[in-house]
A protein has these predicted regions:
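Glycine-rich phosphate/diphosphate-binding loop of Rossmann-like nucleotide-binding domains
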Residues: 161-172, 244-330, 334
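N-terminal ligand-binding/catalytic initiation module
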Residues: 78-234, 459, 463-467, 486-487
Length: 487
């Protein structure tokens, strides 16, 4: 919600629940609050950290619904929401991150080691062997969260500086979920060639780079060129983070409905960076490309249309023009587009036990209750924290980078991403809650760090991109110790 420009006209889109749900705490916990003075039992300082968490510690009234596919009317003013967010970010030390000194600096002797003259010694060693930077500096546990502010989620092209709170929020998640230090870097540059050069010039500082909120199609080339150019992991989370969590939920949904992955028909609404990365992942997992139909704002991607290189890879030789024309007997709907683009009539056309991933945020392509109204046997996932099966990038990116840094991986490759998919899916299946309303772990599942990271690190070594092989038992024990210091 905090990612969206706060306009009165958007109030309906921002509702969390309605009808019989009654009054609900906007942090999306199960509690129902009776009045504005009631306290939310799950309200926490982390609530306003980062929009990808999908929560907000502001009270909403959700008493009324306008029509069958509309959202809800709330009794909250935008002033209250804005004030809560601004107060959170301005309270105490400004912003959300700070630097912590890790060595004692209590004496003149300490100072002589921390800075001149002692600091020259590690400089000389690193000059002889650049790999020593991982031993003598913070590089090995430091990620750059880098944006140019051209596609800040829900806000669009707001520029580098205005995107800084989001990047700080991402840094918070790296630290709180995986113990990774992160610096946010906002670059005021929209030319892809110059952006690549700037990031490449900055890369000696970091052990890995997380690209964030760079608009398509430029984001594809920026990531590809940096991956080719640099010897540290470069990861565009908007693409691949979404794809990994979608992949995990997808595998479990197939298992619950008894489907053969090679036979499923997938219809996708959306052809942006996240959507196409998700489709690449599904094909990597076993979906047949010829069984995938993709729609953008102009309709079905067909061989007759003039398409970008990325979209052309998904073009079908068909006369169908609209989503409604291709969704008949589809097993899976994948939505990364906008609210209202999936209709109940479309769901009725799908195969029995349809799998509906309506991931547009904050308002999905079709609300879960409306999907279930016409298909009670459906499995539904959204990007929202107030519904079951939340597809959230934070389930993977902290652990991917933790594994990549610890194994000294030169890149985050497909084998590592696939290992993360499989580990997340297995973690959900191992839980007693596993079922149609629990196909992926929740964000605060304390098993994530130890249950996902070792498998990713092992995949990095087995696929030849890790410079360090980690002992599985010892590494798991180290992660368990780290986990106790985090959330």
């Amino acid at each position: 919600l905090l990612y969206r420009r706060l306009k009165a006209s958007n109030l309906d889109e921002m509702a969390f629940a309605g009808g019989s749900h009654g009054r609900m705490c906007a942090c999306a916990c199960p509690a129902r609050v009776r009045s504005k003075t009631d306290a939310c039992p799950q309200r926490a300082a982390a609530a306003l950290v980062c929009g990808c968490i999908g929560v907000c510690s502001v009270w909403f009234c959700t008493d009324s619904r306008k029509d069958s596919n509309s959202t809800i009317t709330e009794s909250i003013t935008m002033t209250t929401l804005e004030q809560q967010a601004l107060e959170y970010h301005a309270a105490g030390q400004r912003g959300k991150i700070a630097i912590q000194v890790t060595k004692p600096v209590t004496s003149q002797a300490d100072l002589s080691l921390a800075y001149s003259p002692g600091v020259a010694v590690p400089c000389v060693e690193i000059n002889k062997d650049p790999a020593k930077a991982y031993e003598y500096t913070a590089k090995g546990n430091l990620v750059g969260v880098i944006t140019n502010g051209t596609a800040v989620l829900g806000l669009g092209d707001i520029g580098a500086l205005a995107g800084k709170p989001v990047m700080e929020g991402k840094a918070v998640l790296f630290k709180k979920f995986a113990g990774i230090d992160a610096f946010d870097i906002e670059i005021d540059e929209t030319d892809p060639d110059k952006l690549v050069d700037i990031i490449a010039a900055l890369h000696p500082t970091f052990g890995g780079i997380n690209l964030e909120d760079i608009k398509a199609p430029e984001c594809f080339a920026v990531e590809r060129r940096l991956r080719d150019r640099l010897s540290i992991p470069v990861f565009h989370d908007d693409q691949h983070g979404t794809a990994i969590v979608v992949g995990a939920g997808f595998l479990n949904a197939l298992q619950l409905t008894g489907r053969d992955i090679s036979l499923v028909k997938v219809v996708c609404s959306g052809a942006g960076a996240a959507a196409l990365a998700c489709l690449d992942m599904l094909v990597d997992l076993g979906v047949r490309r010829e069984n995938v139909y993709v729609c953008d704002s102009k309709g079905v991607l067909t061989t007759e249309r003039d398409l970008t290189e990325e979209k052309r890879a998904w073009a079908q030789n068909t006369s169908a023009k609209t989503l409604s024309e291709v969704i008949g007997m589809a097993d899976v709907f994948l939505g990364l587009s906008g609210p209202g683009l999936l209709k109940q009539e479309d769901v009725r056309k799908m195969a029995a036990q349809p799998i509906v991933f309506a991931l547009a945020n904050p308002e999905p392509e079709l609300r879960p209750e409306l999907v279930l109204e016409v298909a009670p046997d459906a499995i539904v996932a959204t990007g929202r924290s107030d519904y079951p099966n939340q597809i959230n990038n934070a389930l993977c990116f902290p652990y991917l980078f933790r594994a990549a840094l610890d194994s000294a991986a030169t890149t985050i490759n497909q084998a590592m991403k696939r290992a993360c998919v499989v580990a997340l899916a297995a973690m959900a299946r191992s839980d007693d809650q596993f079922g149609k309303s629990y196909i992926v772990p929740t964000l605060l599942d304390k098993r994530l760090l130890t249950g996902v990271t070792p498998q990713i690190a092992a995949a990095a070594f087995e696929s030849g991109v890790a410079r360090k092989q980690l002992d599985d038992k010892l590494y798991t024990a180290q992660l368990e110790a780290l986990a106790k210091t985090l959330l």
